[in-house]
């Protein structure tokens, strides 16, 4: 069954809606889903990423997929047309540093907007900061090493931001990076 295309759409993916109470704050679910062999877990940040994730799930006939969606209203971050499906690579640079890059925020879902705001605040202080949206670990891990290194360079502080447990993010942030969940 792990080699059959089936698509699961899940909602309420984080703690963003506190008024629903503690039973609606699934901090461990994303990690648990990512631990399932051959399952592609997508956590898009906006409407464009959601459409691209859906297209990836439809084309991927050899495994099941999960789209973990937020219930809260989120800003539209992708406003320029891209010539390709950026989610298909698992991660991509959403925002390039204006000053010399010293920090890379790596985020998923609703936290991508938070990472963009934090990057803007750092840039205002003269600290260059990229924002990498990483809607799908599994697809990113399948990319060539040079692509992965281009997004997560060794000379920058890598900071992951996801509303969930941080276990697993160290593979991307390294031991010197920071993980916020």
Q: Predicted segments — roles?
A:
Residues 2-5, 11-60, 96:
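Conserved thiamine diphosphate
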Residues 7, 16-26, 59-181:
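Thiamine diphosphate
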């Amino acid at each position: 069954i792990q080699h059959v295309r089936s698509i699961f759409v899940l909602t309420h993916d984080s703690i963003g809606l506190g008024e629903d109470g503690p039973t609606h704050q699934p901090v461990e679910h994303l990690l648990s889903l990512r631990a399932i062999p051959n399952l592609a877990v997508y956590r898009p940040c906006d409407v464009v990423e959601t459409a691209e994730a859906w297209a990836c799930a439809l084309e991927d006939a050899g495994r099941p997929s999960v789209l973990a969606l937020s219930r809260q209203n989120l800003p539209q971050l992708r406003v320029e047309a891209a010539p390709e499906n950026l989610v298909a690579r698992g991660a991509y640079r959403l925002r390039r540093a204006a000053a010399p890059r010293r920090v890379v925020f790596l985020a998923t879902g609703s936290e991508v907007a938070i990472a963009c705001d934090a990057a803007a605040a750092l840039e205002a202080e003269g600290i260059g900061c990229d924002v990498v949206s990483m809607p799908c670990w599994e697809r990113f891990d399948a990319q060539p090493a040079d692509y992965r290194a281009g997004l997560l360079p060794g000379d920058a502080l890598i900071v992951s931001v996801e509303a969930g447990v941080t276990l697993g993010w160290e593979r991307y942030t390294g031991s010197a990076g920071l993980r916020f969940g």
